[in-house]
């Protein structure tokens, strides 16, 4: 195990590992930890779920996307693969790159991946198949389940630019979702987090048995984890919706 620095150990004392915190308390704890750690970069805040699913079964796969109300805190580069009028639509919506087979060949031949999200029209998907080994492992392959295979290119690009994030449970039942930057105001982080919780709840698969959300923690890139109370999160969602 890597040796922890003095600042990290000092920050660790702020968090009670046996306690589950309310969302407001957890955000405050992370802000206090950040003051101690004094990182030289604006750390990403991440929500990590432990789900009661076994994703090796198709009816227990958890996958989806959500538009964060306040974005991720960084500009995402969007690539659209389409043809004809859809290319013009993509450019007008603000896509960073837009093209057809020439873009596909560039990725295949040059291993070019200077983008964060790939959106494709359905007619281009057969041609994209050869990019599976390049885009797949990086989570960049377009998928209709998360809205990146669509004929509504304008909407997809607009949502991506606003801060749409995709999520997919890993083989161990864990789900990692970025929710913003530590520099965000508390209420913005909270609203982003609740949007993610809502999306994950709505993505509950039909084969899930027993407790769906078993554990949730909030952390930054380099900080210790802060445990959240799943029941309190759902209550906060209900309060927001009321």
From Swiss-Prot:
Membrane-traversing stretches: none
Classification via Pfam families: Ribosomal_L1
GO CC annotations, alphabetized: large ribosomal subunit
Highest taxon in the source lineage: Bacteria
An annotated Gene Ontology molecular function: rRNA binding
PROSITE patterns per UniProt: RIBOSOMAL_L1
A GO BP annotation: translation
Keywords: Repressor, Ribonucleoprotein, Ribosomal protein, RNA-binding, rRNA-binding, Translation regulation, tRNA-binding
Subunit and partners: Part of the 50S ribosomal subunit.
Function according to Swiss-Prot or TrEMBL: Binds directly to 23S rRNA. The L1 stalk is quite mobile in the ribosome, and is involved in E site tRNA release. Protein L1 is also a translational repressor protein, it controls the translation of the L11 operon by binding to its mRNA.
The family this protein is said to belong to: Belongs to the universal ribosomal protein uL1 family.
Protein name: Large ribosomal subunit protein uL1
Organism: Sulfurihydrogenibium sp. (strain YO3AOP1)
């Amino acid at each position: 195990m890597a040796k922890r620095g003095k600042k990290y150990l000092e920050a660790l004392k702020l968090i009670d590992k046996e306690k589950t915190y309310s969302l407001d308390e957890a955000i405050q704890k992370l802000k206090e930890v950040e003051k101690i750690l004094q990182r030289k970069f604006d750390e990403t805040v991440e929500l990590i779920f432990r789900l009661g699913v076994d994703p090796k079964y198709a009816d227990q796969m958890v996958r989806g996307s959500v538009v964060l109300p306040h974005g991720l805190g960084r500009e995402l580069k969007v690539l659209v693969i389409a043809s004809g009028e859809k290319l013009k639509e993509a450019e007008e919506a603000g896509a960073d790159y837009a093209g057809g087979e020439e873009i596909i060949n560039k990725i295949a031949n040059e291993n070019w991946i200077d983008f964060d999200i790939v959106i494709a029209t359905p007619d281009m998907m057969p041609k994209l198949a050869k990019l599976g080994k390049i885009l797949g492992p990086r989570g960049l392959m377009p998928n209709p389940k998360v809205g990146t295979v669509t004929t509504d290119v304008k909407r997809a690009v607009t949502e991506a630019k606003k801060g749409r994030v995709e999520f997919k449970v890993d083989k161990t039942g864990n789900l990692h979702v970025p929710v913003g930057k530590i520099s965000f105001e508390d209420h913005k982080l909270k609203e982003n987090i609740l949007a993610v919780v809502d999306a994950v709840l709505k993505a509950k698969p039909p084969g899930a048995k027993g407790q769906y959300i078993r554990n949730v923690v909030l952390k930054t890139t380099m900080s210790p984890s802060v445990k959240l109370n799943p029941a309190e999160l759902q209550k906060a969602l209900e309060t927001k919706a009321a």
